[in-house]
Amino acid sequence: MTARTPAPFTADDYRARMERAARAAADAGLAGLLVAPGPDLVWLTGYAPTAVTERLTLLVLVPGQDPALIVPALEAPDAAKATGAPALTLRDWTDGKDPYAVTAALLETDGRFGISDNAWAMHLLGLAKTLPDSSYASLTEALPMLRAVKDEAELERLAAAGAAADATYEEIRKVPFAGRKESEVAADLARLLREHGHETVDFTIVASGPNGANPHHEAGDRVIERGDMVVLDFGGLLGGYGSDTSRTVHVGEPTDEERRIHDIVREAQEAGFRAVRPGVPCQEVDRAARAVITDAGYGAYFIHRTGHGIGVTTHEPPYMIEGEEQPLVPGMCFSVEPGIYLPGRFGVRIEDIVTVTEDGGRRLNETTREMVIVD
């Protein structure tokens, strides 16, 4: 079985996104946006260069002007194939020409521009030298909501990715665990994600026994034993949108303590989910989940934020973390993933992707959050 891949986006979809981004830039007091290769460029245009090099590629969005993509001439044929290409003007440049001058010709000489967080320093310095009176702001800090609120087509893709992750979990529960290396189970996870439609697999955490106390443990050569708690955290991209799911299974019968801690984490995850509704600050989701774990006496062992946004990448704004006062808005999608990590012993994490609805939240993962016994 493979998850159904939604219909592809159209040039009109990308045109609408670029127009929305340009309006947001103007509302933020910016003269324009300078978007380097990466998630923002993919989201705005559908274009992902096959290789990011020292040659400048940059989307220029200026309110009131047609979008322009500055691109090396040798990359222009591929850029022209991007779904969003009909909605913008390609401005190619050849080796020996100054790409910063090509860019500067489209910009105000003393404007303030939002620039991609992942833009190379050499390109920012080149622009600053060419436009010495200009200034720059982090695109993410200036426009934190640019990709945070998903439309129906994006939600459909995230739901498909979540369904594929659910199907993967249902099947991984059936494979042998005891006597196999973590890396072997991780390979099973990757294979199943691909079988269920993922074009990329970004991570397959299999953290058994004491390794489970490390939230970002990389699956290795440890042989899984009977009596182990095993944290599974896996995801990637399907149809260009992310999945990210965590469940914790037990090899054989768990102890009373292991069941109790799993129940605490499950209750914390449920509390975080129940806190999701429009207008609630992001930090309240973190507080709700964290309170359950703290009240149970394990607050010191919950060592990360409760959640992160997801979309064309598996980690992006908004973040469910103390101090984040951004109100939740219908269409936002993010993880709710509390955990307890006991050093040298074991860990437990339960994670679903949740979307904000008009009257609360909706899970995009439907597999059981109860303790599952595996062989």
Language-model regions: role of each:
Residues 1-375:
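Active-site neighborhoods and metal-handling regions in enzymes and metal-associated proteins
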